[in-house]
Amino acid sequence: MTATPDIVCRDLVRIYRSRDVEVQALQGLTLTVRPGEMVALVGASGSGKSTLLGILSGLDTPSAGQAVVADVDLGALTRRGRTDFHRHAVGFVWQQTSRNLVPYLTIAENVAAVLTIAGVRGRRRAARVREVLALVGIGDHGDRLPAALSGGLQQLAAIAVALANRPRVLLADEPTGALDRVAARAVLATMRAVNEHEGVTVLIVTHDQTVAEQVRRTVRIRDGRTSTETIRDDLGASPGEEFAVIDEAGRLQLPESFQQALGLRDRVRLSLQDDHVLVRRGDDEVVR
């Protein structure tokens, strides 16, 4: 039996109104993330990736379409349901440390606060705090304030806070955006370890291609839609096999590098072969 996906987006549309002008940030985006996957969602500024993360985190609602995370239909959440969703179903790691950690609490107290809100107290809480700090490799820093830690260690602490209540899904928004290369690799390695050993589904939203090279599956988003996917057999090796995504309306976006290399623009010719589709420039002569 196939496991139910942890993240499902079906034809998501998000329209904003700014000064009487409508901006369509998402244009029928479709995405599926299976349990235990670690996926990077990559896109340029304005591609819609941050809008998507806002919806998946339950902080925003789509104008149309459906988003389901950890079996929770985000479009049907009540206020109580949204609170339960944030406490138990998902964890968040944001780029800005101020959104991850309370500055006047120690790292251990930050983790403990999440557990206290969820009703976990006493020895169970203390044990979970020790467990999760050790899991992310900062067990010796629990008594320190966030300001006493480097940016990389602060992000590891943020991962610990996000994992405190054993969520099914971890959402990360540019988690390495403010870090140097060494610290960024340590944060990504920790996320991989959490993904592999805890079975937590991880979705990383980023514009950084080097982040994409550290995960097995990369989904690119462009113009508010998923455009291509890359699957890697070996992390850190050469680029993996490239996939194009066909949405439910039958639309397909070719990788931009393919378009540039072959001079594809405006219209292209399609020919159905035995086991593939041949794509040629629209100005090529038709082979008879």
For the regions a protein language model found, what residue spans apply to each?
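ABC ATPase NBD coupling module
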Residues: D20-V21, L74-V90, G122
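Conserved ABC transporter NBD signature motif
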Residues: G65-D73
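Conserved ABC ATPase "signature" region
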Residues: V72-D73, A112, T116, R123-H141
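Conserved signature/switch motifs of ABC ATPase nucleotide-binding domains
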Residues: R87, R144, A164-N165
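Short coil-to-helix segment of the ABC ATPase nucleotide-binding domain corresponding to the Q-loop/switch region
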Residues: P103-A113
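ABC ATPase C-loop
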Residues: I138, G142, A157, A162-L163
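Conserved ABC ATPase signature
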Residues: L145-L149, L153
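Catalytic Walker B motif of ABC-type/P-loop ATPase nucleotide-binding domains
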Residues: L170-D173
